[in-house]
From Swiss-Prot:
Pfam families named in the record: HGTP_anticodon, TGS, tRNA-synt_2b, tRNA_SAD
Organism: Edwardsiella ictaluri (strain 93-146)
Cofactor names: Zn(2+)
EC number: 6.1.1.3
Top-rank lineage group of the source organism: Bacteria
Protein name per UniProt: Threonine--tRNA ligase
Keyword Aminoacyl-tRNA synthetase carried by entry: yes
Annotated stretches, region: Catalytic: 243-534
């Protein structure tokens, strides 16, 4: 009979098979009440599942992330329970857990409105408040199929027919009269599922295939308690205020239109930000000793077949033809950089060779996934490729890591989560090469004192990689930076250098991106700063305003001085009240407003005010220039006197 070993090493002996819930009760009534599921020998199981052999067991509660994910999954079933009561003809497809919540794809004969979602949310709460038990039954494949055929659940039948072996025993979960199928685990009782909210609905193809029927995807969020739910909803509210699409329109940064889906029309102020960001990256490239190159934006399909992109990536590539040749518009820069490397004989003495490009790339992203600057079809990559020897890998990765943190710190990003993806089952290269490559990446992170977690088997077939995910002020995660080793592409494209023993050697290639897509990074910055860009990035850094016409000439004189000092300045001589002008430029997030009245003209000075409403008093224009230049030159995140 089972001996159960708990996480603290203590053991409990039973003379009969026991469930996870039985073990929780044996430990104490408080734990039994909190028990959502269990981890038995490392595998998540339902609280009702029986254990009939010795095992290590951990009780899962809502304090564990796994517990929160389980209650979110059960909220998806709760959604199914409610929607079948409101609209019995609904056909249920799939309902997985996602970040912060869940969704369910449903086949419904009408398009859900906001009122429908509110009604559905209300019914879900009414059902959850009954605190009913969720009953799990393991049945044969045929029993499961018969149950869903009887309910006319054609999508569940399709899942059984296409994805589940006839030898399996699927888990059926009974929510009163509602039946769902899942691997589980799920909550034992709906008292765990009180803190949720439905958010929105959208279209989604069955199995993600546009040839299949369009279903409706209903999204919801769920949390362990009311406090966590409210905090999340507040973050969403703040995120909506910071939406880069809204701010981009308000500040006249860019627009997008149907004639060019996923392509950005940069307006003057948005393009100013883009060019400033590009200049910053270019400065760092020089500091870290990169060459800057420029490759063609399209190349013959034959080349993309050699690289393997055509075989694995063709659905995401735009193509065109001319004179009986087919060309691919590049989705990435790496093959072009190998072509540049291949020009002229290279020696081991020429390595490492660091090659960077602001490459104009295009990817045929699904139209439904496009989202402002965050998900586009045309974008500029700030990536680079380093050609080096195996012995140089660690030093080069070290340099890449330092560059990543150097650049992110400029924007105030401090929380950066790092993951190291290691060898997948299908890969090229010997185990010795992979051992060394993974060791070099891990050692470089350790040498820089950077904590990281492994992602076993998540590396590309051609090499391991490091991923850098930055967290913004709302703790949202943005995966931007990567350092990826590549043992494949240089050989596929016949790249080589002459080694120390006069032999031809294929170089190791390191793919390195820091910002990723320039467009996306500007979107991230827009939301991070809520449009209050640091002065060095702001499209207009100062605006000079008159109070009456008598100061117009003085305003123009000051504007020219500021412009000559390298400050982006505008003069506002409109016949409007000064309060109106200040409000307008404050809404435009202009860092500094310089006001000129008769007193300022007489003293040869200017009244300085920040966009946050702080009055900095009267200064000479030379002092203003000196202080602004210092703030801009240092790329400070803070304004004067902050």
């Amino acid at each position: 009979m089972p001996v159960i070993t708990l996480p603290d090493g203590s053991q409990r002996h039973f003379d009969h098979p026991v469930s996870v819930m039985d073990i929780a009760r044996d430990i104490g009534p408080g734990l039994a009440k909190a028990c959502i599921a269990g981890r038995v020998n490392g595998e998540l199981v339902d609280a009702c599942d029986l254990i009939d052999a010795d095992a290590t067991v951990a009780i899962i509660t809502a304090k564990d992330q796994e517990g929160v994910d389980i209650l979110r999954h059960s909220c998806a079933h709760l959604l199914g329970h409610a929607i079948k009561q409101l609209w019995p003809q609904t056909k249920m497809a799939i309902g997985p857990v996602i970040d912060n919540g869940f969704y369910y794809d449903v086949d419904l004969d009408h398009t859900l409105t906001q009122e429908d979602l509110e009604r559905l949310d209300k019914r879900m709460h009414e059902l959850a408040e009954k605190d009913y038990d969720v009953i799990k039954k393991k049945v044969s494949w045929q029993e499961a199929r018969d149950a869903f055929v009887a309910r006319d659940e054609l999508y569940k039948v399709a899942i059984l027919d296409e994805n589940i072996s006839h030898d399996d025993r699927p888990g059926l979960y009974h929510h009163e009269e509602y039946l769902d199928m899942c691997r589980g685990p799920h909550v034992p009782n709906m008292r765990f599922c009180h803190h949720f909210k439905l958010q929105k609905s959208s279209g989604a193809y069955w199995r993600g295939d546009s040839d299949n029927k369009m279903l409706q995807r209903i999204y919801g969020t769920a949390w362990a308690d009311k406090k966590q739910l409210n905090a999340y909803l507040q973050r969403l509210e703040e995120a909506a205020k910071r939406d880069h699409r809204k701010i981009g329109k308000q500040l006249d940064l860019y627009h997008m239109q149907e004639e060019a889906p996923g392509m950005v029309f940069w307006h003057n102020d948005g393009w100013t930000i883009f060019r400033e960001l590009e200049a910053f990256v270019r400065m760092k490239l020089k500091e870290y000793q990169y060459q800057e190159v420029k490759g063609p934006f399209m190349m013959d399909r034959v080349l993309w077949e050699k690289t393997g992109h055509w075989e694995n990536y063709k659905d995401a590539m735009f193509t065109t033809s001319s004179e009986n040749r087919e060309y691919c518009i590049k989705p990435m820069n790496c093959p072009g950089h190998v072509q540049i490397f291949n020009q002229g004989l290279k020696s081991y003495r020429d390595l490492p060779l660091r090659m960077a490009e602001f490459g104009s790339c295009h990817r045929n992203e699904p139209s439904g996934s496009l989202h402002g600057l965050m998900r586009v079809r045309g974008f500029t990559q700030d990536d680079a490729h380093i050609f080096c020897t195996e012995e140089q890998i660690r030093d080069e990765v070290n340099s890449c890591i330092k560059m990543v943190y150097d650049m992110y710190s400029t924007f105030g990003f401090e929380k950066i989560v790092v993951k190291l993806s290691t060898r997948p089952e299908k890969r090229i290269g010997s185990d010795e090469i992979w051992d060394r490559a993974e060791e070099d990446l891990a050692a470089a992170l350790q040498e820089n004192g950077i904590p990281f977690e492994y992602q076993p088997g998540e590396g590309a077939f051609y090499g391991p990689k490091i991923e850098f995910t930055l967290h913004d002020c709302l703790d949202r995660a943005w995966q931007c930076g990567t350092v990826q080793l590549d043992f494949s592409l240089p050989g596929r494209l016949s790249a080589s250098y002459v080694g120390e023993n006069n032999e031809r050697v294929v170089p190791v290639m390191i793919h390195r991106a820091i910002l990723g897509s320039m467009e996306r990074f500007i979107g991230i910055l827009t939301e991070e700063f809520a449009g209050f860009f640091p002065t060095w990035l702001a499209p207009v850094q100062a605006v000079v305003m008159n109070i009456t016409d008598s100061q117009a000439e003085y305003v123009e004189e000051l504007s020219k001085k500021l412009q000559a000092a390298g400050i982006r300045v505008k003069s506002d001589l409109r016949n409007e009240k000064i309060g109106f002008k200040i409000r307008e430029h404050t809404l435009r997030r202009v860092p500094y407003m310089l006001v000129c009245g008769d007193k300022e003209v007489e003293a040869g000075k200017v009244a300085v005010r920040t966009r946050r409403g702080k009055d900095l008093g009267v200064m000479s224009i030379d002092d203003v220039i000196k202080k602004l230049q210092q703030e801009i030159r240092s790329r400070s995140l803070h304004q004067l006197e902050e």
